[in-house]
C-alpha cells in the first residue's frame, strides 16, 4: 500500500515557508509545494517585485535542490488586466468597463488566484494531504481544518506567527516584503496599507503608473484603487506625506522577535 501524496500550499509568506522548514526538520512527508501566482497582465507578475524574485530565485531553488521536492507555480487564464477591463453586461452600468477591484470584495482572488488551485486539486488523489500555513496562535483559522486532509505543521509543533518569522529569518528564507509590510499580497491590492502602496510608488514607479494610466481611460465604472482614492490621488498623498516624515511601520513580528 502506497502512502498518500503530501502537498504544501505556499504563498512565500512566513507561515507557509516555515511549514516547509518544519517538514524538513521533523522528517514529515512532503512531495510538492504549490504557489498560485496572480498576474497583472500576461508579462507582469501581480506579486510585489521583491517577493516575486524571492519566490523564483530563492524559495523555488531551495525546495528543489535542498529539500528535494517539486515546486509548482500555477497561473489562471485570467489576469488583473482581464478583470479590470471586463465589460459589465447587465444592470445600470451595463456597457461600462469594470475598473479597479473593490476593497473587501476580492474579485482578483476569485478570478485569478483560486481557479488554478481548484483545477490542480481536482487532479489530486482523494487521499492527498495538504499542509497549510496556519500558526498555533490563529485558533479561528485552525478550527476550520479537519486535521486529516488539511494539516497545520505549525500547530502540531507549537509554533506561533512570531516563531514562524524567526524560523524563516534563521534560515535566510524570510521574504523581503516584511521590510515594508506585514503580509504578502498583490501590489495593486485595494486593501494595501499606506506603507505597501508607498513602496510601489517610490521603488517601482513605472509599475504604479500603469494604474494611473488605467484610471484615465474612458468609460471606467470604478476608478478608485482604495476605498476613497484613485491611484493618482494615492500617489500624490503618499509622496506629500513622505516629504513630511512618513516612516514605514516595523513589522509586528520584527518587534516581538
Residue ranges and their predicted role:
Residues 1-257:
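Nucleotide-activated chemistry modules centered on ATP-dependent adenylation/adenylyltransferase
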Amino acid at each position: 500500500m502506497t502512502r498518500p501524496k503530501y502537498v504544501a500550499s505556499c504563498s512565500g509568506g512566513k507561515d507557509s515557508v516555515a511549514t516547509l522548514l518544519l517538514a524538513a526538520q521533523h522528517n514529515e512527508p512532503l512531495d510538492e509545494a504549490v504557489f498560485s501566482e496572480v498576474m497583472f497582465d500576461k508579462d507582469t507578475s501581480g506579486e510585489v517585485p521583491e517577493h516575486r524574485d524571492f519566490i523564483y530565485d530563492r524559495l523555488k531553488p531551495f525546495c528543489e535542490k535542498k529539500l528535494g521536492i517539486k515546486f509548482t507555480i500555477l497561473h489562471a487564464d485570467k489576469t488583473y488586466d482581464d478583470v479590470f477591463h471586463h465589460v459589465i453586461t447587465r444592470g445600470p452600468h451595463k456597457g461600462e468597463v469594470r475598473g479597479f477591484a473593490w476593497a473587501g470584495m476580492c474579485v482578483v482572488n476569485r478570478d485569478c488566484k483560486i481557479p488554478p488551485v481548484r483545477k490542480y486539486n481536482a487532479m489530486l488523489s482523494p487521499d492527498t494531504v495538504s499542509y497549510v500555513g496556519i500558526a498555533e496562535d490563529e485558533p479561528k483559522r485552525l478550527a476550520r481544518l479537519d486535521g486529516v486532509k488539511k494539516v497545520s505543521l505549525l500547530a502540531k509543533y507549537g509554533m506561533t506567527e512570531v516563531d514562524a518569522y524567526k524560523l524563516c529569518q534563521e534560515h535566510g528564507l524570510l521574504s523581503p516584503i516584511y521590510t515594508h509590510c506585514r503580509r504578502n499580497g498583490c501590489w495593486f491590492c485595494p486593501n494595501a496599507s499606506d506603507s505597501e502602496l508607498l513602496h510601489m510608488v517610490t521603488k517601482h514607479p513605472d509599475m504604479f503608473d500603469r494604474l494611473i494610466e488605467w484610471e484615465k481611460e474612458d468609460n471606467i465604472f470604478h476608478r478608485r484603487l482604495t476605498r476613497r482614492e484613485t491611484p493618482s490621488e494615492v500617489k500624490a498623498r503618499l509622496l506629500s506625506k513622505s516629504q513630511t516624515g512618513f516612516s514605514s511601520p516595523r513589522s509586528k513580528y520584527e518587534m516581538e522577535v
